[in-house]
């Protein structure tokens, strides 16, 4: 707070604006209590009440529907975090920038940061004291270089900034894929297999930021995922596992803040990725962790050398924090499963768990392989027996029964399972063999169609790499709910549909339904 500027009081007004993770407040240019021209030189202000402080980005308006002359309008995130009723008088002053920003500037200049400096930055991030611009500055500074000690300090600070779970079991397993592959909903098959065996697997997952579905978005089609800490513990106690949204239990909140900025800017460096994943797994109380690194031309990791470097980073951090970490590389050349988008991916998962004859074989096989690795952490299971045990649990229906138990424990979903009513097909332009699939382009196309906000939007794949196709045969179908999304997706597919048949792009269908 600036001591030379007097504070004034304004009444809280709730402004129904979704400003993402950033706190934003609005004052009137004709404010009776505050002179807007004085505040114009300050990008941030402090709201204070009974020891509670909220830092927010300031906007000035001429619209009385956002803030009257005696009011300060709080965006939805700011209103939720300040947690005071509409009409409450609060003190408003220009904000002093967080002291930790000096360390951010030092990092940009090339200095190595101490553990205390990194801890201060993460603490301020976790309390939403940074604007998106300041977050980007930290990410850019860290992207230039980060030492091993800084990586460990960053991981530890992020893990300690939120909820830290402790479990009574000596072995608590978990798995994580670094992402980038459409579909690939293996966690929703692996968790019930491992839980049915008896190993605890408390799986917390993220929502999509730049992809058409995260595990939490897909699980939400089947069950409630906004579960609190105590309820999560009760579910794991009764079911040996869960599939919930990690943001609701406040695991590594600073990481969620960083991800919200770094993903859209494509600033996801190897070190930041490792710190992000490991901080959440450490905070979740996992003792044994399996990391899946898909490798492919349009995946996050494109080659074996890059995958090896990433593996060593995961193993290094895991060792320093006393965790057993196993890293495997998998085929990242194409989507896993037939669906891209929450409802379509949930359908794939339930088909695999139900041993449906039309279930995607790639999703089934990859899930069995991953589950096998985790099951072999059970000291009572002899070495090499993991795959057979995983297949037994899946084929017998035990995994499906366990999934239903988890769904019942988490509570019913309120989401529709209907697919988008509008659709169009992408068809092969000529006879041949599917030679390549662009994962990144399909992800973008599914998002353009409305996923994950519209859970029934997305893409259903009919052909994979190596499949023979005839001219005019559908390669995939795009689903949307609204005409604008349908038309945007059709235009995007016309510009590049993500499939190559004998090295040539397919052409979009002229017909739509």
Swiss-Prot record:
PROSITE patterns: THYMID_PHOSPHORYLASE. Its EC number is 2.4.2.4. GO terms for molecular function: 1,4-alpha-oligoglucan phosphorylase activity; thymidine phosphorylase activity. GO terms for cellular component: cytosol. InterPro entries: Glycosyl_Trfase_fam3, Glycosyl_Trfase_fam3_N_dom, Glycosyl_Trfase_fam3_N_dom_sf, Nuc_phospho_transferase, PYNP-like_C_sf, PYNP_C, Pyrmidine_PPase_CS, Thym_Pase_Put. The keyword Transferase applies. Pfam families: Glycos_trans_3N, Glycos_transf_3, PYNP_C. Gene3D superfamilies: 1.20.970.50, Nucleoside phosphorylase/phosphoribosyltransferase catalytic domain, Pyrimidine nucleoside phosphorylase-like, C-terminal domain. It catalyses: thymidine + phosphate = 2-deoxy-alpha-D-ribose 1-phosphate + thymine. SUPFAM superfamilies: Nucleoside phosphorylase/phosphoribosyltransferase catalytic domain, Nucleoside phosphorylase/phosphoribosyltransferase N-terminal domain, Pyrimidine nucleoside phosphorylase C-terminal domain. GO terms for biological process: pyrimidine nucleobase metabolic process; pyrimidine nucleoside metabolic process. It comes from the Bacteria. Keywords: Glycosyltransferase, Transferase. It is an enzyme of class 2 (transferase). Belongs to the thymidine/pyrimidine-nucleoside phosphorylase family. Type 2 subfamily. This is Putative thymidine phosphorylase.
């Amino acid at each position: 707070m600036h001591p030379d500027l007097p504070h004034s009081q304004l009444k809280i007004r709730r402004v129904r604006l979704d400003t993402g993770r950033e706190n934003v407040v609005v004052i009137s240019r004709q404010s009776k209590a505050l002179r807007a021209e004085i505040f114009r030189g300050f990008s941030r202000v402090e709201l204070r009440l009974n020891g509670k402080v909220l830092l927010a980005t300031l906007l000035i308006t001429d619209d009385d529907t956002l803030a009257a002359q005696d009011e300060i309008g709080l965006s939805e995130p700011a209103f939720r975090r300040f947690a005071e009723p509409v009409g409450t008088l609060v003190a408003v002053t220009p904000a002093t920038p967080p002291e930790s920003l000096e360390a951010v500037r030092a990092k940009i200049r090339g200095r190595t940061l101490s553990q205390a400096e990194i801890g201060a930055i993460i603490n301020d991030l976790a309390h939403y004291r940074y604007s998106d611009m300041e977050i980007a500055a930290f990410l850019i500074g860290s992207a230039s270089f980060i030492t091993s000690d800084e990586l460990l300090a960053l991981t530890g600070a992020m893990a300690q900034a939120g909820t830290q779970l402790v479990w009574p079991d000596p072995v608590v397993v978990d798995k994580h894929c670094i992402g980038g592959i459409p579909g690939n909903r293996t966690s929703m098959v692996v968790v019930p297999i491992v839980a049915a065996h008896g190993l605890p697997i408390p799986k917390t997952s993220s929502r999509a930021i730049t992809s058409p579905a995260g595990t939490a978005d897909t699980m939400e089609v089947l069950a409630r995922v906004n579960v609190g800490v105590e309820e999560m513990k009760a579910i794991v106690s009764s079911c040996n596992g869960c599939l919930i949204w990690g943001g609701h239990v406040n695991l590594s909140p600073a990481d969620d803040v960083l991800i919200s900025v770094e993903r859209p800017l494509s600033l996801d460096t190897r070190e930041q990725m490792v710190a992000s994943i490991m901080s959440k797994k450490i905070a979740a109380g996992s003792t044994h962790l399996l990391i899946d690194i898909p490798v492919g031309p349009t995946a996050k990791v494109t080659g074996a050398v890059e995958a090896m470097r990433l593996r060593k980073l995961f193993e290094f951090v895991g060792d320093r924090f006393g965790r057993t970490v196993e890293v495997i590389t998998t085929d990242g050349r194409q989507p896993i499963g037939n669906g891209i988008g929450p409802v379509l991916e949930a359908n794939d998962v339930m088909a695999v768990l139900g041993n449906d004859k039309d279930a995607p074989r790639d999703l089934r096989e990859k899930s069995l392989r991953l589950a096998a690795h985790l099951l072999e952490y059970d000291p009572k299971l002899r070495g090499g027996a993991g795959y057979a045990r995983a297949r037994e649990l899946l084929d017998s229906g035990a995994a499906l029964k366990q999934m239903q138990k988890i769904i019942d424990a988490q509570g019913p979903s309120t989401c529709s399972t209907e697919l988008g009513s509008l659709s169009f097909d992408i068809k092969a332009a000529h006879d041949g063999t599917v030679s390549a699939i662009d994962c990144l382009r399909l992800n973008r196309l599914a998002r353009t169609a409305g996923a994950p906000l519209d859970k029934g939007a997305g893409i259903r794949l009919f052909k994979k790499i190596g499949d023979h196709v005839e001219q005019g045969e559908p390669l995939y179908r795009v689903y949307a709910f609204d005409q604008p999304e349908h038309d945007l997706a059709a235009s995007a597919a016309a510009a590049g549909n993500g499939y190559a048949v004998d090295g040539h792009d397919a052409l979009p269908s002229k017909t739509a339904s």
